[in-house]
Amino acid sequence: MADLEKKNVQAEGVSENGEMSEELQKKLKELDKESNTAEYKGICAKVIAVICICFSLFQIYTGFFGALDAMIQRCVHLSFGICLVYLLCPTKKAWVKEGRFHPIDVALAVLAMIPPIYILVNYQQLILRAGTVTPTDTVIGVLGIVMIIEAARRIVGLPIVIVVCCFLAYGFFGPYLPGPLAHRGLTIKQMVGHLFFTTEGVFGIPMGVSSTFIFLFILFGAYLEKTGLGKFFIDIANAIAGWASGGPAKVAVISSALQGTISGSSVANVVGSGSFTIPMMKKLGYHKNFAGAVEAAASTGGQLMPPIMGAAAFLMAEFVGIPYMEVVKAAIVPAILYFIGVFLGVHFEAKKNNLQGTPRSELPPWGKILKEEGHLAIPLIAIIGLLASGYTPMKAALAGIFISIASAMLRANTRMSISDIIDGLIKGARGALGVLIACSSAGMIIGIVTKTGVGLKLASALVDIAAGNFILLLFCTMITSLILGMGVPTTANYVITSTIAAPALISLGVPILAAHMFVFYFGIIADITPPVALAAFAGSAISGGDPLKTGVNASKLGIAAFIIPYVFVLSPEILGINATLFSVTETTITALIGMVGVSGAMIGQLYCKANILERLLLLAGGLCLIDPTILTDIIGVVVLGGVFAMQYFRSKKSK
């Protein structure tokens, strides 16, 4: 039996020690376009390494001594990034195998650097003639916009290109549009002047955040990965829950929650921990569709888990106008509720199929793990402490980088060599490219929205569609975020929905942080929402399951993420908004009880298998507890209490 299981795991492209076959790696890279960059050999690899090292050192320098003037910082950031994108996402991959750059890619890389370098060289002149766009400026600006769009196609994907082009077209064809969507229209000169030569477009807030906070946090994550912190998380999760019913699946949930504290990518999280946890779940007896779904749901939650959430969380702090630490504090309780919801789903599935955990004798002892690997958590603890102490995210991330290198030196088996430190600089720069280009693309969207006023028009249209019905407006906003999230990266998705949908919610009295967090959540959860569920597709690629069924199972497990945003809009106290200890506790407890009911309904199990009526009652009772009114809370508790009692006594009789 063990041999059959082993063969089954290996057939899906994962060996016993978690190593993935080339075919599986290729599949996963296709799903995670941002990490699907070329691996050159020879002199080309050295050229890439030098550019990446210079890029990372520039970011570290400005992090240490302070960012340069906004436009200069962002232009240098874009110059490095866009050059690397054209070299690392080549026209013809056959040239990569031969260890050569394609001449077209080299030419495009040079061409793409000309617009930001033009701004750097002519910076003082551009300031003196602010608002005046010369013919040369127009040509350079058009070139810059076109090169960014092509870079986005290469490293982010076609959907964001389509969205950006739609907004650009809207800017041009405003006079020909019907009704409230019509506007005077923008000339090429006006559009280029606004999008490329101000800090309202390409070089706007998203690029500003990318060139300061985000890059350094990605670099910090690269060094934490080099130390082996991911393995420490899996070992700790094994010690906590490996022995319990359905142990390996619970290990996946806990390790992904911990991994999410340092990573902001759903697919990367699935790939990072799924190669170990998914085979473990399959060996225990979980169906391959469910095993892939567990990892997908847990890994997607990583972007919701502080202190390092997705790149969009840094943008949220800027858009809302609050310190990043306030976003982190607001996100803590909802993130914990989400992972409890996934954990409950896993637990009920294990009980339903009588799946046992790993014997304690086969698990590593707590003491040994902490003794050998505990020092790896020092950087994470330090960065939380620094953020809580009032350090800016940029300074905290910079300190975290140096602390991660220093703490790794405490034991010989984790000590970094000079080549490891250099490799961290290279990996950090490569890892930042997708976010960088997504931010520059998102900047164009913001530029068109602010220049044409379409944001307010669409927000008003959303309110009209919902006919002033608050719940219907929330539902329309949710659908918009989910649809955008199916093909557009979280960063761009958040930018679009926060400029269009969030104002509609705010106009009806929703606190600004709650409105932004609402669209943020649904943009992320799109990664497990069929039909385009990238995290679920990655999980199914490792498990060998059906992508669509894996996505459906992941959505069931992650049902909390579809409910929690409604909770913090209806009860903003859960985000710490105008909250007292009593109100936060009450909202959290009722939401938690509701989560038990909804998870039980999704899986069809509590103490024993639930029938259709019980599942409907569990769902209804759980949803009642979302509404903050006392009446609905009482109804929810009574309904759930009745089902729990029926289940309990029926399970006793069956024994």
Residue ranges and their predicted role:
Residues A2, K6-A45, K329-G431, L534-L623, ...:
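Long, contiguous bundles of hydrophobic transmembrane helices that form the permeation core
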Residues M1-G131, T138-V142, S654:
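Conserved, well-structured core domains of diverse proteins
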Residues G221-E225, S256-S265, A297-Q303, G443-I446, ...:
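Transmembrane alpha-helix interface/packing and boundary motifs in multi-pass membrane proteins
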Residues E150, I155, V163-P180, I188-V192, ...:
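Core transmembrane alpha-helical segments of multi-pass membrane transporters/permeases
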Residues I234-G302, I308, A312, G321, ...:
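Hydrophobic transmembrane alpha-helices that form the pore/transport pathway of multi-pass ion
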Residues P135-V139, E200-F213, A239-V253, L284-F290, ...:
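Membrane-interfacial loop-to-helix junctions in multi-pass transporters
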Residues I48-I53, Q73-Y86, I104-M113, T138-M147, ...:
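Hydrophobic mid-bilayer segments of alpha-helices in multi-pass membrane transport proteins
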Residues A38, T62-A67, C89-G99, Q125-L126, ...:
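Membrane-water interface regions at transmembrane-helix termini and the short interhelical loops
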